[in-house]
Each structure stands twice: as C-alpha cells, then as structure tokens.
Curated annotation (Swiss-Prot):
Name recorded for this polypeptide: Tyrosine-protein phosphatase non-receptor type 1
Gene Ontology molecular-function annotations: non-membrane spanning protein tyrosine phosphatase activity; protein kinase binding; protein tyrosine phosphatase activity
Residue ranges, annotated region (Disordered): 291-319
Any single GO CC term annotated in Swiss-Prot or TrEMBL for this entry: endoplasmic reticulum
E.C. no: 3.1.3.48
Protein species of origin: Gallus gallus
Subunit structure: Interacts with EPHA3 (phosphorylated); dephosphorylates EPHA3 and may regulate its trafficking and function. Interacts with MET. Interacts with NCK1.
Keywords associated with the record: Endoplasmic reticulum, Hydrolase, Membrane, Phosphoprotein, Protein phosphatase
Role played: May play an important role in CKII- and p60c-src-induced signal transduction cascades. May regulate the EFNA5-EPHA3 signaling pathway which modulates cell reorganization and cell-cell repulsion. May also regulate the hepatocyte growth factor receptor signaling pathway through dephosphorylation of MET.
Residues covered by the Tyrosine-protein phosphatase domain: 3-277
Protein location: Endoplasmic reticulum membrane
Catalytic activity: O-phospho-L-tyrosyl-[protein] + H2O = L-tyrosyl-[protein] + phosphate
Family: Belongs to the protein-tyrosine phosphatase family. Non-receptor class 1 subfamily.
Gene Ontology BP, a term: actin cytoskeleton organization
Length: 434
C-alpha cells in the first residue's frame, strides 16, 4: 500500500519533523477577527488558538454568538466535525447550547480535566454524586444517566433538556482518559478500538448533527482523531484505497481550523493508525477483535490523580549521654504548616510543551469566611505546636548538658586533687633539699 511505503520512507529518513514543518508552512491562514474582539477574550482558552471567521460555529441565543469552535466539512468523506476547545467555567453553557442547536448526538473528549497539575478543561458534565447540572445562562439541564468505565476510556449516557421547550435528547459522551497532552495514545490498536466504539454508536451518522470533538485547545489530539477517521472513510469510499494522501487530507482540514495536529509524533501516529485501520477496510474483520484484546479495555482504569511517592525519611544525628545517635525524622519542621498553606493557593495558568504560558479564566471555587477562619486557626495551631516543640527540644538539650556534667564531675575532681598534691610535694622537695 502506498501509505505504508511512505511511512517507512519517512521513518528511515527520520523526516517526520521536516514534513510536519512543510504542513505548517503550506497550511491555510484566514482571518479570525471575531475571535480577536476584546469582548470575546474571556471565551478563549488560549490566545493563539482561534476559529476562522468563515468556519466558526455561531450561537443562536443571546447578544453574543461567539464560541471557540469550528465546523470542519469533509465533502468527499461525507463527514462533518465540530472541533472546539475544552470548555471554560464561563462557557460550559455555551458548549451545551452549541450541542443542542447543532443537533449533535456525540461528544468526544480526548483529555482529562486536570493534566500535569494544570486545568485543561472545566467539569462540564455531572459527576456520579451530583447527577444533574443546570446552565442558567442558556436554560439547559444535563443529567447523567449511566457510566461505563473501561481501562482507558469511559462512555457516559447523558440527557440534555431544554428547559424552555421541555424537550430532551440523549447525548453520548466518549471520554478518552489516557491520551497525554502533545502526545499519542498507547497504541494504534487502543485508539482504533475507541474510534470504532464511537462509530458503532451511530453518533457519526448523517441523520445527526456533527460530532463535537475536543481536547484542551481543540487542535492536537482532536485533529488526530478526525484525520484518522476521515482517511479511513476515504479509503473505504474510493476504488483505489492507496490513493489517499494523509498530508493532503490534513491540509484540507486545516482550511477550517488552524493548527490541526500539533506535533510530528501525532502526525506519525496518524499514519500508523490509518495503516492499521486499513486492514479492516480491506476486508480483514478479525482485526477489530484483535484491537479490543490488545487495548486491555477490561482492566482497572488508572487512578484519576496519582499521588507522588513519599519522600524518604530525613536522617539526623545528635549527641546523647556522650554518644552519637542517628534517627529518622518522619515529620520535618513546618511540613504541616507548609502543606496547609500550599493547599489554599491555586493558579489558573496553563503551560504547554513549548514553554508558553497562557492564562485562562480562573475556576470559581466556593469558600466561606468560616472555612478561612478554620484554615487560619489550623495554621496558627500548627505554628504554636512547632514553637512548643522547638522550646521542648532546647530544654532537652540543656538537660543533656547537665547530665553530661554530672557524669564527668567526680573524675575531674580526682584529677584536680592529684595535680594539686603532686605540685605540693614537688615544692616541699625543692625547699628542704636545695
């Protein structure tokens, strides 16, 4: 197959970075005037990722129709996608308004809410414990009906209700939970297993509106997902599947949203996934079952937040009764206070892998004066306890010094007496015999 030959050629020549740069230089560039308008600044997660004016999704409610989302229409493949950023706290209502107005049935989420200590997306769907969310700005209600958790993805059944018309719709939420930012999935098999789950649900069918796909910025992981799906569709539709040119398909998609595919590794992975997926297109139905087995989807999922391993205890030495003793210090001084203070501080800045830092709208957290007072009191008590420990330690050292003096005192007295008697005898000898 031609795409496989091209992949091996690029691999052998180590040309992925070069071809990725070529795509960046050849990509379309269109105006983004609406996105850059000052009143829309707080609706953009990143200041350098904006929808083109000609392909942006427009909201129908309210006096501002802007949302950072783009409609990508792949005519030959007969597939449309809405690529958007991870919702901000102030745009969650706009997100679900878009889903409602565009008649979308599926939402594909390719990131976690929190990644490497940074907030990548607001919690825009209800958790198990709360079940429901209300969006007063758009008069919508979202209910969690069911949740199927696999090792690396979760499928949620949601019910979206328009409180104005009392109409309800089923929404399927496909959440890929182990795809790292600026990275690639574990394997083409796991990715294709996920893609075909989305396909089999009917969420991509033409009788529904475009599927909504997002990650954090809505260009890297989202672009990879849509590129692979489109290439496989084209291979299935064309008489000559090998005629599909991945690079040209990506350049076509970039006419609708900037920056799709963020790294050379994501481009390389897209080729790998298309090559593997082509086996199914060419008639090998058994590969789909192989993808499922290789993906290990039935294993336990990783924890949402993996805590760092504990630090080894600090070794300290001290003198006691004239001997040196070592002991492990499991609770270093002020550790409790520092942890308490650290927990009360948060940041809304997000850092991407090329070193840029973008400020997003800060998350709104509920806090009361009572909580603040408790935190202050806890810190004060910890400081008092620490000071008391320091005082006790000082007294203990003084007691040790006194004990040492008591132990050595008889010995020192004997030495002094012996020295005095010897000196006296010597003086008597000098006087009497000389």
């Amino acid at each position: 197959m031609e795409i496989e030959k091209e992949f091996h050629r690029l691999d052998q020549a180590a040309s992925w970075a070069a071809i990725y740069q070529d795509i960046r230089h050849e990509a379309s560039d269109f105006p983004c005037k609406v996105a850059k308008h000052p009143r829309n600044k707080n609706r953009n997660r990143y200041r350098d990722v904006s929808p083109f004016d000609h392909s942006r999704i427009k909201l129908n409610q309210g006096d501002n129709d802007y949302i950072n989302a783009s409609l990508i229409k792949m005519e030959e493949a007969q597939r449309s996608y809405i690529l958007t950023q991870g919702p901000l706290p102030n745009t969650c209502g706009h997100f679900w308004e878009m889903v409602w107005e565009q008649k979308s049935r599926g939402v594909v989420m390719l990131n976690r809410v929190m990644e490497k200590g940074s907030i990548k997306c607001a919690q825009y769907w209800p958790r198990k414990e709360e079940k429901e969310m209300f969006f007063e700005d758009t008069n919508l209600k979202l209910t969690l009906i069911s949740e199927d958790i696999k090792s690396y993805y979760t499928v949620r059944q949601l019910e979206l209700e328009n409180l104005t018309t009392q109409e309800t719709r089923e929404i399927l939420h496909f959440h890929y939970t182990t795809w790292p930012d600026f990275g690639v999935p574990e394997s083409p098999a796991s990715f294709l297993n996920f893609l075909f789950k989305v396909r089999e649900s009917g969420s991509l069918n033409p009788e529904y509106g475009p599927v909504v796909v997002h990650c954090s910025a809505g260009i890297g992981r989202s672009g990879t997902f849509c590129l692979v799906d489109t290439c496989l569709l084209l291979m299935d539709k064309r008489k000559d599947p090998s005629s599909v040119d991945v690079k040209q398909v990506l350049l076509e998609m970039r006419k609708y949203r900037m920056g799709l595919i963020q790294t050379a590794d994501q481009l390389r992975f897209s080729y790998l996934a298309v090559i593997e997926g082509a086996k199914f297109i060419m008639g090998d139905a058994s590969v789909q079952e192989q993808w499922k087995e290789l993906s290990n989807e039935d294993l336990d999922p990783p924890p949402e937040h993996t805590p760092p391993p504990p630090r080894p205890p600090k070794r300290t030495s001290e003198m006691h009764n004239g001997r040196m003793h070592e002991h492990a210090e499991f609770f270093p001084k002020h550790q409790v206070v520092e942890e308490e203070i650290r927990c009360s501080v948060s940041t809304a800045e997000e850092t991407v892998s090329d070193g840029r830092v973008f400020s997003s709208v800060p998350l709104i957290t509920d806090s009361t004066s009572q909580d603040t007072e408790i935190r202050r009191r806890t810190v004060g008590e910890n400081l008092h306890v620490t000071a008391h420990k320091e005082e006790s330690k000082s007294e203990s050292v003084e007691e040790d010094d006194e004990n040492m003096m008591t132990t050595w005192k008889p010995f020192l007295v004997n030495i002094c007496m012996f020295t005095f008697l010897t000196a006296g005898a010597y003086l008597c000898y000098r006087v009497c015999f000389h």
